[in-house]
Amino acid sequence: MMLSLRRFSMYVLRSLRLHFKKIIITLLTIQLLFITIFVLGGRSSIIDGNWKSFMALFFKPLAYTNRNNNHASFDLRSKDNVAKLYEKMNFDTSGKWIDTYTLKNNLLTVKMGPEKGQVLDSVDELRYYDNDPRLVWSVLLDHLLESDSNEYAFSWYDWANFDSTNKLIALRHTNISCQFVCEGAFDKNVLEMVESEVQEPLFVTNRNKYDESLWYNRVRKVVDSNSVQQAIHDHCMNNDAYSNGTPFELPFIISEISERLRPEVYDLQAKNHLLYSNFTPLSLTVLDSDKDAYRINLKTTDSSKSNIVQTNLLQNYIKRHRNEMVNGDLIFNHTSMFEKFLHHGSTKKRKLDVEALDKTIYAGEYLELSPSDFQFNAKERIIELETRLRSEGLPSHDTHYLRSLKTSVNTSPALQQKYFAEASDITDATADGHHRDRRFFSIGHNLLNDPQEFEARLNSLIRNFQKFVKANGLISWLSHGTLYGYLYDGLKFPWDVDHDLQMPIKHLHYLSQYFNQSLILEDPREGNGRFLLDVGSAITVGVHGNGENNIDARFIDIDSGIYIDITGLSVSSDAAKQYMSKFVEEESSGESFSALIEDYKFDENDYFDEVDGREGLAKYTIHELMEWVNSHPDDFTDAEKNLVTKTYKKELAISRSDYAEKDLSPKQRYLVNEKYNLYNCRNQHFSSLNIISPLRNTMFSGVSAFVPNRPIATLNNEYKVPAKYGLLSFQGKVYLPEFRYWFSFADMKKFANLQLKEPKITRLESPLNDLKFSDISLLITNILKCGFHSVFASLFNSFDSTVYRLKELEIQYDPSLSEEEKSSLLKTLRRGMSKKIKSPEKDPIIYIYERKLWENVEKLLNASNIYNIASQVEKEKGKEFVERSQQVYERNFDGFRLPDGGNSKTVNDLNSKGLNLFGDNKKTSNNIFGSDQKY
């Protein structure tokens, strides 16, 4: 495509200005050269041959020293700074940034492309920018404080990650067409032209594969030209605004994400589609840690034309803060601005307080639930909202919720279409596309290959969801694999790629009414998480139906597409199947299920509607619906017929099974479930009220969380939990209780030298199931020698979380303690230690930022210097880890000396309380997971 005359003119003018600046800089450098020679005489002259020391005078980077009142950048050649960066990148999980973000050093300095290194004169010259949270938060908060309005023009460009698309905007000479992003894998020639011009790789994850000829030929061989042309025709068009030189525009517009793409291609399509789609959140929900939340309403605007430059918010910010400039530069201090926002008078009107919710529920040790929490009257809620709509109007969230309710009640469970869309059609299975939201799929910086980056994402997800529900008084608890992982060390299993939580149906509806389609923003003092709360369209349906909508809601990380699955539990007519007899007999003091049913009177003539207010086909039983479909075949698509048939066959299978409920109708099943407090999600996971309630207050990933009253019973309904707490192996992982950590067995064979194949690694002499304390120090040394840096970082950073869970287990399962003693000790532990637990993983955005800085260090310093610096940092951290572990082993850990709740001067020492699961975990009596304990 030929450059337009306007673009060409702009390019010529910029080039002339750039060359003019270079001439001036060259003249100044020559002048400085002669001055230096004159001043230094023979000490550092070219004539003496000391060229390196002489040139160092000119090329020494800026350090933190602040000369002439300039805001200095971070010096990556300073060994002290490199050590500081390595320590911060691996062992500091706080929300603090390693440097400051400024107007000149960051925003106006061109980072890539032909003009790399040039400092622009004004933000009006920006064609793209990195949406660093410090920049966006500062501008947004300043706008809200200066404006009477609580509205804000939203753009995905300011909140999601557009690093790769910015590289396409930065291009001046290389023309990119739809074909580049519609082929299953990138054309290497075009890819290299792009990277040559921007002077950076377009992506990092598996970029090296494109340089392997066998791999490249294989993935390109499957590219079918006809399919590509069809994909271009159906899903992609060239962007005239880009051709005309309009800033922030991409060369093409994706109308729909294609199928069968490699992750890096899918990533680029998904980002493009997100930017140009009509889909935007209804609001922003800003967290004040886990204490409060604030609502910012969003204007209905074109996301691709509403970023902080296009709407002049950035320009206005600079004008208002011009008096803070130093030599034309300006610091964006977002945390200071956030503090100002929290304490400003106008912020009170933005505070979220849902009348039906109680924000104090997380203050106690227990939370009692009632049967009413698991029931919901859709018809009543619809009437209430429609009455308000007619009399006073409804806020956008209520309007959206009302629409969802009506859609749900009037759609048969057998005809519900799948709501959530995953990136399941990605051609690389390692991308876990089936566990990623299609709209937000991203390969991140190196998400598929860097375990620290991946675990940081999952950790940020669960921590922020828990802070979100606590700040608003919403009830949820850990479930499925997430609960199972918590059981051992207070963390997720390392093989899990998402999280699972459950809610009572009443609170699922609060979640939907007040927060559906809100972008949840983490407290910027603690991190930089951005998550879309998305509730599905089947929120009044409690039965499995056609199985297409087992998940009620998702909490989605918009920078990766990784999510939390949220399911609501309610009374329904689903069959509990193999669990029914067990649940009912437990609730009924041992009476058999058949005897109970025999005495229970059902009147099948009474009208029964599981969801009150349904109309049309939604009112039909599955038998009636199947009959209707068969008699009106032209009214249904083949897909709809298949869904109804599938649902019908499932119902028939129950009547032909040996389940206790095989002779019960849906109405009878509903009444039995209601009578005996049996609740289920749409994925047919059943539980009873006394297994769930009272919920227990605990810590998970370093933040408050609820778990069911009887976690072992809950898990044994789904898994088979080994009774013993000790050495375990599963899916190639090994749990070592001395470390409270799941190691890869392949890694362990190396750092324990189990097969004597590592001559430089001291062999572990003790068997894995009988480690001595001295083995801990040896294994830490070996882990570092073997280069398992991310493993050690994870061990170090999760120490607080895992020792908290260790002490919790020791108290909960000590048979010598009474229920009252356990309750008192657990209360002391939680209230005294919870606020001191650091996050077990880094904030992912800060980690990626520091990771990129470190990659620059690797280009600047030789490998030997880097190794020495990193080794010294890790040696000190390894020593600290062993010392803290020894304190726990000797039951002398400072962290377990906690203040008394009523008297801050009185110290409760919990070291000696409870079992000794660390120093004595080999006992056969440590079968603590054989059953639930009362506490």
Curated annotation (Swiss-Prot):
For biotechnology, the entry says the protein is used as follows: Mannosylphosphorylated glycans are found only in fungi, including yeast, and the elimination of mannosylphosphates from glycans is a prerequisite for yeast glycoengineering to produce human-compatible glycoproteins.
What broad taxonomic lineage does this protein's source fall under? Eukaryota, Fungi, Dikarya, Ascomycota, Saccharomycotina
Q: Which residues lie on this side of the membrane: Lumenal?
A: 43-935
> Domain text from the record?
The conserved DXD motif is essential for the function, which could be an indication that MNN14 has transferase activity.
Q: Where in the cell is it found?
A: Golgi apparatus membrane
* Topological domain ranges for the Cytoplasmic compartment: 1-21
Species for this entry: Saccharomyces cerevisiae (strain ATCC 204508 / S288c)
Q: Which UniProt keywords apply?
A: Golgi apparatus, Membrane, Signal-anchor, Transmembrane, Transmembrane helix
Q: What happens when the gene is disrupted?
A: Eliminates N-glycan mannosylphosphorylation, when its paralog MNN4 is also deleted.
Keyword check for Thylakoid: no
**Gene that produces this protein:** MNN14
Q: Does the keyword Mitochondrion apply?
A: no
- Please identify the protein, giving its name as recorded: Mannosyltransferase regulator 14
In which family does this protein belong, per the annotation?
A: Belongs to the MNN4 family.
Q: Which GO terms describe its cellular component?
A: Golgi membrane
Membrane topology of this protein: Single-pass type II membrane protein
